[in-house]
Amino acid sequence: MERVKMINVQPMLEAAEFLERRERECEHGYASSFPSMPSPRLQHSKPPRRLSRAQKHSSGSSNTSTANRSTHNELEKNRRAHLRLCLERLKVLIPLGPDCTRHTTLGLLNKAKAHIKKLEEAERKSQHQLENLEREQRFLKRRLEQLQGPQEMERIRMDSIGSTISSDRSDSEREEIEVDVESTEFSHGEVDNISTTSISDIDDHSSLQSIGSDEGYSSASVKLSFTS
């Protein structure tokens, strides 16, 4: 029973403490139980302030919208100029017929699409042909290497044989030249004997000098060579 009484009294105590705390706050000025009524001056001054804010907001929004509109117009103008330039370049790149004097944008784009498809098809054919040519080139190169293998070995063998023969021939010719040089070497006494003998023979046979024979010319040349 006492416990039930304590449960019933507890909310009442909490409510009393709450009311007491609110009274103290009102006394110190932290809060008021009733809101204060606004003065007539404030009531009349608030609506004009709200109107001025609305006017400022409306004027600011109008300026912003005007700036946005001008920016949009400028961007649209630039976009149309760029599109016109691209269409002019497209007319130059696409082969157009002589009877086509005026083109619409849609017709020009369709012709460009068809022309691009033709170019892609031609590129595929060219690539396929190039691959076939490269394959044929590799086959011919391997075939040429196979054919040149025995011929190259034969040529190298013949070159080696020819070089050996030429070296032997040059050695024999060098020996013959040395033998000829050794056979033509004379002493000073032999040269003097030959010169005196040839001079006496020429004096004894002076009549032969008048004849324009080969022996006369040879003897004269021998005389000139020894006298010099």
UniProtKB/Swiss-Prot annotation:
Chain residue ranges for the region called Disordered: 29-76, 162-228
- Family annotation (Gene3D superfamilies): Helix-loop-helix DNA-binding domain
Q: Which CDD domains is this protein grouped with?
A: bHLHzip_MXI1
Specify residue ranges for compositional bias: Basic residues: 43-56
- List compositional bias (Acidic residues) regions by residue number: 173-183
| Signal peptide as annotated in the record | none
Q: Spell out the InterPro entries in the cross-references.
A: bHLH_dom (IPR011598), HLH_DNA-bd_sf (IPR036638)
The question of whether Zinc is a record keyword is answered with no
- GO molecular function terms noted in the UniProt entry: DNA-binding transcription factor activity, RNA polymerase II-specific; protein dimerization activity; RNA polymerase II cis-regulatory region sequence-specific DNA binding
From start to end residue, where is composition biased (Polar residues)? Answer: 57-70, 216-228
Q: What are the record keywords, sorted?
A: DNA-binding, Nucleus, Repressor, Transcription, Transcription regulation
Summarizing the function annotation, the protein's role is:
Transcriptional repressor. MXI1 binds with MAX to form a sequence-specific DNA-binding protein complex which recognizes the core sequence 5'-CAC[GA]TG-3'. MXI1 thus antagonizes MYC transcriptional activity by competing for MAX.
Q: How does it assemble?
A: Efficient DNA binding requires dimerization with another bHLH protein. Binds DNA as a heterodimer with MAX. Interacts with SMC3. Interacts with RNF17.
What is the name listed in the Swiss-Prot or TrEMBL entry for this protein?
Answer: Max-interacting protein 1
The gene is Mxi1
